[in-house]
């Protein structure tokens, strides 16, 4: 239940420094509390009730869906949630003058590899006509929010299986989102990078700074050999914070790239789960989540599943060599750093 320490380390500075009337601050606090309570209940059942299954999956998913609906509907109906779609910086008398368009409630989002970095979800529903296209876009966006919150929080939860794994990866992702939040909150910087300016998103900078600081402090004691563990209290909440902050900044479509490690953890878990449930003879990974694949020898896999085959057997004499968890963790960090760097580079690739 070390995740309680992470949550406390986030909430105290936010409550002291943040603007509590900001809708963005309130959404992030709600995310922390809802998923924190959900994760704590799961840890409590596992630890004190001695039930290794913990909270029922339907209850856990229900909590994630509820949070996703709260976030999505708040973004839809709160008058305080608006963006500035176009910001121009003009030079007059050797001075920069910022020219902004009116703040609007928008269904636009940031998408990499395209000329203006923008995708309007309403464009996907032009077939419905001008009367319905924006309403359908918001319905889609709310459902997408629910999916992203559930997917990223579960991905973070699956990633928490080795000392320092989830805390290190999440700190890197959080630092990237912190930089994006700063850019989104600054009209001049947003204009230079051709990104949306989001008034009030400076409160996300405060929250994400506390988030990254809490994770780095936790990593000090969670690195191998770990003295403390975050449990579901920490891992579920961390994923939710990453998801909701990206959605608020209209950067949710960057998450498959930025959180690629979480994505592959989910894929590996689905692959192995499908294999076990349906009695398949072949699977891609030896074990799930993905990080466990790298510390499972091929001989151990064959002992457990003698009549089964696997795509990625591993390397070494007889495919029996496995990596130490420290090496696996550091390599996962390196992959996350590369994904974070590439995520930022996408703004210059058109």
Describe each region flagged by the PLM.
Residues 46-56:
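Membrane interface segments of multi-pass transport proteins and intramembrane proteases
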Residues 35-46:
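Alpha-helical transmembrane segments within multi-pass membrane transporters and channels
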């Amino acid at each position: 239940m070390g995740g309680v320490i992470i949550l406390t380390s986030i909430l105290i500075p936010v409550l002291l420094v943040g603007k509590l009337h900001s809708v963005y601050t309130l959404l992030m606090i709600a995310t922390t509390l809802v998923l924190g309570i959900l994760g704590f209940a799961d840890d409590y059942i596992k630890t004190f009730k001695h039930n290794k299954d913990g909270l029922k999956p339907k209850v856990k998913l229900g909590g994630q869906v509820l949070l996703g609906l709260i976030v999505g509907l708040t973004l839809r109906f709160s008058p305080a949630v608006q963006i500035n779609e176009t910001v121009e910086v003009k030079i007059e008398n050797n001075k920069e003058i910022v020219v902004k368009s009116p703040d609007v409630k928008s269904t636009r989002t940031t998408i990499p590899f395209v000329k203006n970095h923008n995708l309007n979800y309403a464009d996907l529903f032009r077939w419905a006509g001008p009367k319905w296209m924006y309403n359908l876009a918001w319905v889609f966006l709310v459902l997408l929010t629910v999916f992203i919150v559930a997917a990223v929080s579960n991905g973070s939860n699956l990633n928490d299986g080795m000392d320092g794994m989830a805390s290190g990866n999440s700190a890197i992702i959080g630092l990237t989102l912190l930089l994006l939040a700063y850019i989104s909150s600054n009209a001049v910087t947003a204009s230079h990078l051709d990104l949306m300016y989001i008034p009030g998103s400076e409160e996300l900078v405060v929250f994400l700074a506390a988030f990254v600081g809490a994770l780095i402090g936790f990593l000090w004691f969670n690195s191998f050999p770990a003295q403390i563990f975050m449990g579901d209290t920490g891992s579920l909440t961390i994923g939710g914070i990453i998801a909701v902050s990206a959605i608020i900044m209209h950067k949710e479509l960057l998450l498959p790239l930025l959180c690629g490690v979480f994505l592959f953890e989910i894929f590996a878990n689905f692959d192995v789960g499908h294999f076990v449930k349906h009695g398949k003879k072949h699977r891609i990974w030896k074990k799930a989540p993905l990080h466990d694949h790298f510390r499972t020898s091929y001989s151990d896999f064959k002992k457990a599943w003698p009549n089964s085959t696997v795509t990625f057997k591993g390397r070494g004499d007889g495919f029996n060599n496995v990596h130490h968890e420290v090496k696996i963790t550091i390599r996962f960090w390196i992959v996350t750093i590369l994904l974070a760097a590439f995520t930022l580079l996408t703004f210059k690739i058109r």
